Amino acid sequence: MGFEIAAVSDRPELAPVVAAWLVDAFGYPGGRTVEEMTALLLAPPVGPEETFVLFDQGVPVGTASLAHRDLEARPDLTPWLAGVFVQPAFRGRGHATALVRRVEAFAAAASVPVLWLYTWTAEPLYARLAWRRAGLETDQKRGREVVLMTRRLSGLCQASDFGH
């Protein structure tokens, strides 16, 4: 396919690039700055956490993370598939799917039984990837309704089976 996926923990120089994408794509007034997001990406993990970057022909074009916390309204749920982003010029090539599968494989290898995510735009993508709708929630930071989704990971293959 012409792409590879690397962990930010193995390539810390990618943290500012990922931080800029995340702040641009998911930021909100009064939210984290690029510098704060970079520091968060480089901070020691809380449980099984990792951020991945997908390279297309050697160029970083997308990211996704396994995060301990994500949706403020649901601190009881953990961990989360978070920050799934692919640069617009590289969408439609299966990159988001590859990133989601990489995070799922990482989580499964860490014996995570269930993952959570929330989205306001990509429910069809996640539904195609066997995520199921778990309800509606309010994203308090952005003041919008979001779809809460979940995926049971028991029985998934190891990370090496997902082409990383």
Predicted segments with their positions:
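Conserved active-site alpha-helix within GNAT-family acetyltransferase domains
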Residues: 109, 113, 120-144
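Short hydrophobic/aromatic beta-strand or adjacent loop that forms the aromatic wall/cage
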Residues: 49, 143-149
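Active-site rim helix/loop that mediates acceptor-substrate recognition in acyltransferases
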Residues: 26-55
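Conserved beta-strand in the GNAT
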Residues: 53, 59-69, 80, 85
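Conserved acetyl-CoA pyrophosphate-binding loop and the N-cap/start of the following alpha-helix
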Residues: 90, 94-102
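Conserved hydrophobic beta-strand within the GNAT/NAT acetyltransferase core sheet
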Residues: 84, 115-117
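Conserved N-terminal entry element of GNAT/NAT acetyltransferase domains
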Residues: 1-13, 155-164
